[in-house]
């Protein structure tokens, strides 16, 4: 007797053929849910992406309104300006025959190796048309808004292969695309939020195991995915590879009769990595040869607390600012702590384990989650800030490339597994239990929804017209050595890119300073709003400018009030002022150091002999700066990014007091 063909097992992957074979309701009786359920797979995928993008915009656009061309979606601090330079650098270098991994016009004349600089070459190449059309600020904002949507969408693709259901898969994508990891790094870390390549790699592997993707296409597509990931972030490439290897071992253990299919897919993955090694040989060689001598971030200070999993941080919409008295004890900062999933998510995991305990895939997913949780805790388990038992995370600091990754970011991969678990658990519910599963999973997703960082200023990001209207070519010679004095760190890179890389600079904010420049703060440049403001002595400044052959100094109009005295003190004279920038050069005597006429203290306040002469701060209400003192007594109130709701009460009390004392100028400053 001929056997009927085997039906797919309960947890077998689903092919496009099976998805298309679902029964279709009659057109005249189809509800909206039925129409979505029976739509073509590509149309469902498009709808999912649009919904994720709409949610992203609803969360992150309100703080800046329609000002996507003038303000940053993130806080606009130094990293954002570094990315704007990086996005422009790679296309320019390729088009002009320069090696993209070496910037000769930064830290000139020696130049700087960019292997360990987050200059995001992959994003620079794919976004080149956007940069040409809209400029670097709009391009950066668009990429930042695309990142959560792409991460959620790639996770949706994974969930669809596991469930063949649209709505559960749509829900599953939320857990990764809007996770605490994404929320924290949306403050400015473009290279870290572009993590969609990780779930996309998982999707391709599932397609290969189920047989719906040919070996050749699988190797080609996975190679492209990995190369793109490496060009976005070497850290994400390393952690994706590491946790992918862990997932592969777990899959072999729990795959049962499918072990050979998993093993064959693993061999093809290895072939893809060989292709990646060939394509990126120069990049990888540079990375290993120029690897920092010390771990960039110590493990004991960059791991998560056990409480991180259930206590929300500031970037969480529900309860984010209610527990700062607890989270202030955690080792990870609010921005970097990716651990939060919430108590409801833990309830969902318990329900998943109880109802699906007979399936191998259940224990494979839970085992992966447990391993991520242990490694994210670093070398010591911290409970509400208190160190307890030792953990195996310390050995990661001895693995090349991976040793510079930080455990506090590892929970991103737990969020990916959590999204798949949510989709599977909801899709398998029947009868009244289905509603219970939907409610629990829906509440878990709602609990992690992010809010824009309350401490972010969303700075204005326009480039001075001097660099875009041709003035820079009139006042600065091509390849001239130029020192930049700016209002914010890394603006010197933004200016350089906007000029079309017209001149050279001896200093820059590029993340870690090259080893040969360590210990010399002037190599980070001079900026008004630095975290650790530095003003050199006239003698040191004059020596630096002379030793590096600097013949012109570009000064932001908003930086003159602070650095004007030291510029005059080394013999510089302003020769041009306009379009937001001044051009300063020396007289016939060259650089001659003498005592400045005023003593400038660290920060944004200029003191001379104890008397407040001038101050300048960004205004929340517009691009103008609050200046003074205008011959009035001035009272300053400084508050930091860890403020909780008590800050609001204090500020309201301060506002009431200011209204009763019109003779005193009261200014609240976010530090």
Regions found by a protein language model. Give the residues of each.
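Short active-site neighborhood of thiol/selenol oxidoreductases, capturing the structured segment around
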Residues: 625-649
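Extracytoplasmic
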Residues: 16, 295-297, 442-599
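Start-transfer (signal-anchor) and selected internal transmembrane alpha helices
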Residues: 1-63, 265-274, 354, 360-368
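Periplasmic/ER-lumenal interhelical loops and adjacent helix-loop junctions
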Residues: 77-94, 266, 277-353, 404-407, ...
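Membrane-embedded helix bundles of polyisoprenyl
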Residues: 52, 143-162, 166-253, 269-277, ...
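Membrane-interface helix-loop-helix junctions at transmembrane boundaries of multi-pass membrane enzymes
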Residues: 39-40, 255-267, 349-390, 431-436
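Structural microenvironment flanking redox-active thiols in thiol-disulfide oxidoreductases
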Residues: 647-671
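Membrane-interface coil-to-helix junctions
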Residues: 55-151, 180-195, 303-330, 380-395, ...
């Amino acid at each position: 007797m001929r056997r009927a063909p085997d039906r797919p097992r309960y947890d077998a992957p689903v092919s496009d053929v099976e998805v298309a074979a679902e029964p279709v309701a009659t057109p005249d009786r189809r509800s909206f849910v039925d129409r979505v359920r029976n739509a073509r797979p590509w149309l469902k995928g498009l709808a999912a992406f649009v919904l994720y993008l709409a949610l992203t915009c609803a969360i992150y656009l309100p703080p800046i309104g329609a000002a996507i061309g003038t303000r940053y979606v993130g806080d606009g601090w130094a990293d954002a300006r570094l990315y704007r330079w990086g996005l422009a650098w790679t296309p320019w270098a390729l088009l002009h025959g320069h090696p993209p991994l070496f910037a000769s016009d930064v830290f000139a004349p020696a130049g700087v190796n960019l292997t360990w600089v987050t200059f995001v070459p992959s994003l620079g190449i794919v976004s080149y048309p956007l940069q040409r059309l809209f400029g670097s600020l709009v391009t950066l904002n668009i990429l930042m808004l695309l990142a959560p949507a792409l991460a959620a969408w790639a996770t949706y693709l994974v969930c669809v292969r596991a469930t063949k259901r649209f709505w559960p898969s749509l829900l599953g994508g939320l857990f990764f695309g809007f996770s605490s990891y994404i929320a924290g790094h949306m403050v400015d870390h473009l290279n870290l939020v572009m993590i969609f390549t990780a779930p996309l790699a998982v999707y391709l592997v599932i397609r290969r195991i189920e047989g719906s993707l040919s070996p050749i296409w699988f190797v080609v597509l996975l190679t492209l995915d990995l190369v793109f990931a490496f060009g976005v972030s070497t850290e994400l490439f390393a952690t994706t590879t590491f946790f992918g290897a862990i997932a592969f071992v777990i899959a072999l253990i729990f795959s049962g009769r499918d072990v050979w299919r998993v093993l064959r897919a693993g061999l093809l993955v290895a072939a893809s990595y060989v292709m990646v090694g060939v394509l990126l040989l120069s990049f990888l060689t540079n990375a290993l040869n120029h690897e920092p001598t010390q771990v960039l971030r110590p493990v004991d200070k960059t791991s998560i607390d056990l409480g991180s999993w259930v206590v929300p941080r500031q970037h969480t919409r529900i309860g984010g600012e209610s527990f700062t008295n607890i989270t202030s004890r955690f080792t990870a900062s609010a921005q970097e702590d990716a651990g939060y999933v919430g108590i409801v998510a833990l309830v969902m995991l318990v329900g998943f384990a109880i109802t699906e305990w007979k399936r191998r895939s259940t224990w494979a997913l839970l085992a992966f989650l447990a391993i991520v949780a242990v490694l994210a805790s670093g070398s010591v388990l911290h409970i509400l800030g208190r160190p307890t038992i030792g953990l195996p995370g310390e050995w990661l600091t001895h693995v090349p490339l991976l040793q510079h990754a930080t455990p506090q970011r590892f929970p991103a991969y737990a969020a990916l597994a959590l999204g798949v678990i949510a989709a599977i658990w909801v899709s398998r519910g029947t009868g009244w239990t289905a509603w219970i599963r939907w409610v629990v999973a829906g509440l878990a997703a709602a609990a992690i929804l992010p809010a824009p960082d309350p401490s972010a200023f969303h700075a204005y990001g326009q480039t001075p017209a001097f660099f875009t209207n041709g003035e820079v070519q009139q006042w600065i010679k091509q390849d001239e050595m130029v020192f930049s004095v700016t209002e914010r760190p890394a603006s010197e890179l933004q200016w350089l890119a906007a000029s079309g890389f017209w001149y050279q600079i001896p200093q820059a904010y590029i993340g870690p300073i090259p080893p040969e420049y360590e210990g010399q703060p002037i190599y980070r440049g001079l900026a008004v709003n630095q975290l650790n403001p530095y003003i050199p002595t006239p003698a040191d400044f004059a020596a630096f400018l002379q030793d590096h052959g600097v013949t012109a100094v570009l000064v932001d109009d908003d930086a003159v009030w602070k650095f004007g005295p030291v510029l005059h003190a080394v013999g510089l004279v302003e020769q041009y002022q306009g379009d937001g920038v001044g051009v300063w050069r020396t007289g016939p005597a060259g650089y001659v150091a003498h005592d400045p006429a005023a003593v400038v203290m660290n920060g944004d306040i200029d003191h001379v002999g104890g008397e407040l002469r001038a101050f300048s701060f960004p205004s929340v209400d517009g691009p103008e700066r609050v200046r003074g003192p205008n011959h009035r007594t001035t009272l300053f109130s400084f508050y930091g990014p860890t403020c909780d709701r008590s800050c609001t009460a204090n500020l309201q009390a301060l506002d009431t007091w200011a209204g009763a004392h019109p003779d005193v100028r009261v200014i609240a400053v976010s530090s």
